[in-house]
Amino acid sequence: MIVKLYENNTNPQQVRKVVELLRDGGIIIFPTDTVYAFGCDIFKPSAVEKIARYKEKDARRSDLSFICQDLSQISEYARMNDEAFKLMRKNLPGPFTFLLQGSHRLPKLFKNKKVVGIRMPDNNIALELVRELGNPLMVSSIFTDDDTLEYLTDPEL
C-alpha cells in the first residue's frame, strides 16, 4: 500500500491509515529530516525484528533508534539529567540522535540495552505519526554503505 503524506499538510485520515498499519505490526518507509527510514511500532517485536533482518542485524544487539514526539515522551523512555535535557531542548527538533540510558518503559526486546538512540526529527510527517500512534517509532535509516545518498533523500528517484 502506498500512502502519500505531505509535510506541510498531513491529511489526518491518511495518518490514521498509516498508524493502523503500524498497530497491526506493519513496517513503513517514511522521510525524516535527514534520510528516509524504516519505521515500526516499538511495541511490535516481530516488526522490529523484520527491520533488523532487512538491515542484516540482530535486533537485540543493533543500534536502532526511536523517534519521540516531544521531550515529555523522551523522558518516558529514556533517562536524562538536567544537562541532557537543556541540550535537547535547545537542539530539538533537529537532525540529531541522542544516546541516552533507557528507562523501565522500554519494550522487553530493548530491556538489555544500556543505551538507546533517541530522535525528534524536524519533520512534520514523522512527528505526526508518533503523535497519532501514542508511543515512539523504532527507526533505522534505509541507507547502506552501497547506496547513493541522493537516491535515499529524493523521493522522485
PLM features per residue range, with description:
Residues M1-L157:
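Active-site-adjacent structural elements in enzyme catalytic cores
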